[in-house]
Amino acid sequence: MTSIQVNGPGDRAAARHGDPRRLRSTAFGLMMFLLVQFALGMVVNLYVRVPAGRAGYGPGWPVLVLHGLVGLALIAGSVSLAVRAVASRARQAAVPAVTAAVALLVAAAGGLRFLGTGVEGASLVMALCAAIAIGCYGLILYRLPGAGPQPGR
């Protein structure tokens, strides 16, 4: 475990509610993981036949399973980041983190709909929601200060 150096009353509040600068690394990791997920989704879209009746997924089913597992991990990570951002009371991180978590939940629902029906619009929902989440994590990286030395310290 790591500790936060507490020098004054403002630092005590940051330590109690979580330092928002620590959210940057999680947002960066989720954004990179989302790019991998996006690439897996493209492979599934191009090379895996998803039948409407679930008769069989062909030889590309391992990529489809990996895509689903990565999606579940992303949802867990995004919800964790959203909870931590809200708890840290850093509005500049909380709003995009919650938005990204909701977008990934909608993407998962689109994925389940696509598996059940084969409707192309559900695949589009997944891609657009992934893009929204990537943008939200980029916004967190832009808005939050880095972990390096801060001005005035």
Per-segment meaning from a language model:
Residues 2-153:
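Polytopic transmembrane helical bundles with strong interfacial aromatic enrichment
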